[in-house]
Amino acid sequence: MTVYHFVGIKGTGMSSLAQILHDMKHTVQGSDYEKRFFTQTALEKRSISILPFDKNNVEEGQVIIAGNAFPDTHEEIVAAKELNIPVHRYHHFLGDLMSQYTSVAVTGAHGKTSTTGLLAHVMQGAHPTSYLIGDGTGHGVENSKYFVFEACEYRRHFLSYNPDYAIMTNIDFDHPDYFADINDVFSAFQEMALQVKKGIIACGDDEELQKIQAKVPVIFYGFGEDNDFQARNIQKRTDGTIFDVFVRNTYYDTFKITGYGNHSVLNALAVIALCHYENVDVEAVKHQLTTFEGVKRRFNEKPMGEQVIIDDYAHHPTEINATIEAARQKHPEREIVAVFQPHTFSRTEKFLDEFAESLSKADQVYLCDIFGSARENKGELTIEDLQKRIDGAELITDTTTDVLKKHKNGVLIFMGAGDIQKFEAAYVKEVQVAEK
């Protein structure tokens, strides 16, 4: 019996892939740092073993899948090579796996995870669908027709894939530790476009995506009249959003979604366009759109007394804009409070003014110290450099969250890609202690 061993199983993509293989009746185990990470909950529910890193975890007969964050010098990878066991990097293994299905890659600087989650939810309402979402969620179906997966542009990892379809949500400059500029980002997406086998669904409102060249049809969606799929007559309500879809200027149907903000309409349009081209029944699409509950760390909302707490992964100015816009649509009468933790020194420095501009759209801003990722832990920049660019911004630590209590009827949005959740947890605990 083959055992699949994951080196770095708590990574968001790795965790999802492990879940898929387990659901397909394979034996799966993995290793990682002992620090608890949100992705391990789904692994534990499936009784997938999570071991501390140890070269003795590697044994003959295993299939070794290694996370991209771990170098060839990692003790388990070295042990595998000493035993002449091939080591499959995550993105290469995923590329091989998806070739067995009608595959749909969802990529873009922003909106990948939400769109992948929405597409998976809609498709599985009509056909058996396996999916891999970048929030650590994976689901495998043995007789799948479709394989829907999130494809990341960072370090051009998505060039390991040759999908049947690609949804491209947008092109924006991010990951300044790797990409030189927007032209470098575009070149990566252009190269990816040439690897797609059946068709590309791209946001036509995005100026960069308008320039994409491909060997397959490129179908554009968006708000502009030149798009193949266009959203019109948009009704933004506190219980979701309703809009009409026109296909090449001909009315197609009216859809309701559970999401808020223009970005949610665009995500849904991409899904509607793909389903149209795969002849998925429109009534099934409409129903599934109304039952989507979202993905982890993307506008996850919970009430707490008179306040509302939202947990969101937003870590780029464009994403912060979208999250604040969505909060204002759903809660038009409430004070919007942003609690933001910048992620990586390189990104914070590159987009310092843009971060200040986007955060200033909240009524009050609190800033946590910069979170240095595993890729870089040093920088001369400090959080005060961002604070002085935002009127009234205050600094906050996980021991001073009680200051948030004064926003009696506020919507508190905890945003970031680092460990912002510990600040949220500290505040929730603070409130619970005070209520006793």
From Swiss-Prot:
Its main location: cytoplasm. Its EC number is 6.3.2.8. It catalyses: UDP-N-acetyl-alpha-D-muramate + L-alanine + ATP = UDP-N-acetyl-alpha-D-muramoyl-L-alanine + ADP + phosphate + H(+). Keywords: ATP-binding, Cell cycle, Cell division, Cell shape, Cell wall biogenesis/degradation, Cytoplasm, Ligase, Nucleotide-binding, Peptidoglycan synthesis. One of its GO terms (cellular component) is cytoplasm. One of its GO terms (molecular function) is UDP-N-acetylmuramate-L-alanine ligase activity. Disulfide bonds: none annotated. Pathway: Cell wall biogenesis; peptidoglycan biosynthesis. One of its GO terms (biological process) is cell division. Pfam families: Mur_ligase, Mur_ligase_C, Mur_ligase_M. InterPro entries: Mur-like_cat_sf, Mur_ligase_C, Mur_ligase_C_dom_sf, Mur_ligase_cen, Mur_ligase_N, MurCDEF_pg_biosynth, UDP-N-AcMur_Ala_ligase_MurC. It comes from the Bacteria. It is found in: Cytoplasm. The keyword Cell wall biogenesis/degradation applies. ATP binds at G108, A109, H110, G111, K112, T113, S114. Belongs to the MurCDEF family. This is UDP-N-acetylmuramate--L-alanine ligase. It comes from Bacillus cereus (strain ATCC 14579 / DSM 31 / CCUG 7414 / JCM 2152 / NBRC 15305 / NCIMB 9373 / NCTC 2599 / NRRL B-3711). The gene is murC.
